[in-house]
Amino acid sequence: MSALTATIAGIGFWTDGLPDWDAATAFARDGVRPDTAPARPAPQLLAPNERRRAPGSVAVALEVALAACRAADRDPATLPSVFASTHGDLAITDYMCETLATDPTAVSPTKFHNSVHNAAAGYWTIGAGCTEAATAISAFDGTFAQGLL
């Protein structure tokens, strides 16, 4: 069996209070957070209407994917992609289960649209104008490793 090798050409990062890789490395080095950081990323790949409609998990996925492409100087429209999530969007899953159990006719069409596991991959291909292969994967504790494979 031969060893697998990989190269990281670009990194994207986002979490509350640390909106990019530079902020994250500065925090790790100095313990200082930026004075201002957005509460939620605003993925520039999406039109304003789609940006408002996209759930937070999709906004983060698109923000970090685009940042990684920019850091690698790669055009996102030309790249196949893998979006990996341990649980998907739990807030939407919880909403869907509760609403279907209590008042099925009240399900929001937008939330229903975003309840699928491949929502981030779909928004990515539309926003980036990418016609390359896009995959969404979930493997619980093995999600990160499976996403790399």
Where are these regions (language model features)?
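Conserved "HGTGT" condensation-loop signature of ketosynthase/thiolase-family condensing enzymes
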Residues: 1-135, 142
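A contiguous pocket-lining binding segment that forms or flanks enzyme active sites
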Residues: 145-149
